[in-house]
Amino acid sequence: MAGLKQHSGLVVPLDAANVDTDAIIPKQFLQAITRVGFGKHLFHEWRYLDAEETQPNPEFVLNFPQYQGASILLARKNLGCGSSREHAPWALADYGFKVMIAPSFADIFYNNSLNNHMLPIKLSEQEVEEIFQWVWANPGKKIDVDLEAKTVTVGEKVYHFDLDEFRRHCLLEGLDNIGLTLQHEDAIAAYESKIPAFLR
């Protein structure tokens, strides 16, 4: 898995607070247990005018022409509240989002996002409001995220964010739980070699 060190991308300004996981990916799409294929159902109830997903809602921000190809989601507080479905970050990642910026995230959603190699950035409500205003005023322009420096650069302004160092290390190095285990492969093999044959 590739590491996430710096990222430059378009921002979708989702001007809503308390966006729950059912809005992100409704329950009727949760049958699959693989991580791919959910992006087309992302924000289903808001994004489409029909259940068959053939009529995009022209009033929903994800369908606006200037935000096509966006990889950064900007939202208000408590993003990802509701049920703990891991399909929510799967859908966001499958759509193409790599970074999310909000004043706060639901705890389980926050951890699930990190586990799925997406970067959830917490900034103050005032900072998030400033970014909303900039994005609305500058359609089509990208912002820059630097995980090594823990900064978000929006126009001429630089915002600083915090992230647990262990989580930061995993994102920088592209490590999931399996990758973390493999970092200790030699130590595991050495330990296993000491186990009596009849216990192996």
UniProtKB/Swiss-Prot annotation:
It comes from the Bacteria. SUPFAM superfamilies: LeuD/IlvD-like. GO terms for molecular function: 3-isopropylmalate dehydratase activity. The keyword Cytoplasm does not apply. CDD domains: IPMI_Swivel. It catalyses: (2R,3S)-3-isopropylmalate = (2S)-2-isopropylmalate. Pfam families: Aconitase_C (PF00694). InterPro entries: 3-IsopropMal_deHydase_ssu, Aconitase/3IPM_dehydase_swvl, AconitaseA/IPMdHydase_ssu_swvl, IPMI_Swivel, LeuD. Keywords: Amino-acid biosynthesis, Branched-chain amino acid biosynthesis, Leucine biosynthesis, Lyase. GO terms for cellular component: 3-isopropylmalate dehydratase complex. GO terms for biological process: L-leucine biosynthetic process. Pathway: Amino-acid biosynthesis; L-leucine biosynthesis; L-leucine from 3-methyl-2-oxobutanoate: step 2/4. Its EC number is 4.2.1.33. Catalyzes the isomerization between 2-isopropylmalate and 3-isopropylmalate, via the formation of 2-isopropylmaleate. PANTHER family: 3-ISOPROPYLMALATE DEHYDRATASE SMALL SUBUNIT (PTHR43345:SF5), 3-ISOPROPYLMALATE DEHYDRATASE SMALL SUBUNIT 2-RELATED-RELATED (PTHR43345). NCBIfam families: leuD, PRK01641.1. Heterodimer of LeuC and LeuD. Belongs to the LeuD family. LeuD type 1 subfamily. This is 3-isopropylmalate dehydratase small subunit 2. The gene is leuD2.
